[in-house]
């Protein structure tokens, strides 16, 4: 199989990268009726598989799970979860031939083998769906021409998909139709109905392409979503301990600090996050963020270049073929870091303290979001896609670190995301270590001295303008406003 993106000419590549349209709520007036009586079979019962299935069943659809015979015979976790929730479970041979819609929600590295196994069993004219397009775009999987191929990709972990649905809402969702596999011209209708069944239409749906989803998703998870958080945690902890901060407190300030500062980001973007700082702290966070961007911009651009060219996928798939040797080694090394092994502190930290003593953390988030967003847009990815793969998902990943540090983050994210995170982290740590070590303790761990809160008015005005007037802030305000409006409509 050859990389699908690389098989296209430049004009086709740019057209696919630039596909992104925020769909109007009225386009989902038919709900999930288009697939109401279909037999829908889900492959994989992990977080996305189980929670999407629960939502779709609650929306009135017919859901079953196809598992490998050994998973059923040995009553593995996937079988246990599906049966505990009252779903019909069977083998591929038992369920796939009668399926109208097959949802491939298995891990990326299993896609080629899984799709190769189910395709001969799928009936003429059936539909195959993905929640991530890596197999189609990077591996170049070719699907039988009579099969419709779609994507429905909720922009959050599977548990959040379920919780938001139970609240009567949903999560922002990306949908796409593979242009090589839309024989009946109804791929978009199927994807819309599927997204509606999971609750995605209540939060906002982007009509995109397989290529735009893959390239932006890989970039976001490698840089701001995982790589920057891991790098900041490791270096920030080392810095505080070297400055004499008690290890448990240092770890807690970072572990819970990521979640606290990105909660402000979630509600009001970079502007709101920065406004949580005092005026002197805001100025310093802005200056640090500018320094970080200068240092890291070439690394962000290299990751984007390697993602666009297919170099990242090529090297990662080599590691797949080598039994994940690099991934497993890097995972073990992360588990040995000081941050991961620091004692758990029971000391209470007030919410505002995470901002006051975490100026560096705020600067890392600001720099990472802006760099990731701007780098994606400069590569031809539309702003809305870049926003969802940078600022929007950052609080969701920070929440995982708040539970069990980097271990939890790397368990929850895909192996593809984890591999890319380690690549970024290994390059970013040596780039930033001297800068972080040279910082004043006031910027992480101690907080600014209370002697004066005075600032230069003109400097503050200029910095406030620079914070507010960026593309990521403009598009973020628009998309967050849409979600707020939708919550009001759904709750009415």
UniProtKB/Swiss-Prot annotation:
GO biological process assignments: isoleucine biosynthetic process; L-valine biosynthetic process
Q: Where is the KARI N-terminal Rossmann domain?
A: 15-208
Q: Which residues bind Mg(2+) 1?
A: 217, 221
Report residues binding NADP(+). 45-48, 68, 76, 78, 108-110, 158
**Does Coiled coil count among this protein's keywords?**
no
Q: Which reaction does it catalyse?
A: (2R)-2,3-dihydroxy-3-methylbutanoate + NADP(+) = (2S)-2-acetolactate + NADPH + H(+); (2R,3R)-2,3-dihydroxy-3-methylpentanoate + NADP(+) = (S)-2-ethyl-2-hydroxy-3-oxobutanoate + NADPH + H(+)
Question: One GO molecular function term?
Answer: magnesium ion binding
Tell me which UniProt keywords the record has, alphabetically. Amino-acid biosynthesis, Branched-chain amino acid biosynthesis, Magnesium, Metal-binding, NADP, Oxidoreductase, Repeat
Q: Where is the KARI C-terminal knotted domain?
A: 209-353, 354-486
Q: Tell me, in a sentence or two, what this protein's role is.
A: Involved in the biosynthesis of branched-chain amino acids (BCAA). Catalyzes an alkyl-migration followed by a ketol-acid reduction of (S)-2-acetolactate (S2AL) to yield (R)-2,3-dihydroxy-isovalerate. In the isomerase reaction, S2AL is rearranged via a Mg-dependent methyl migration to produce 3-hydroxy-3-methyl-2-ketobutyrate (HMKB). In the reductase reaction, this 2-ketoacid undergoes a metal-dependent reduction by NADPH to yield (R)-2,3-dihydroxy-isovalerate.
This chain's protein is named Ketol-acid reductoisomerase (NADP(+))
Q: Which classification does the entry list for the species?
A: Bacteria, Pseudomonadati, Pseudomonadota, Gammaproteobacteria, Alteromonadales
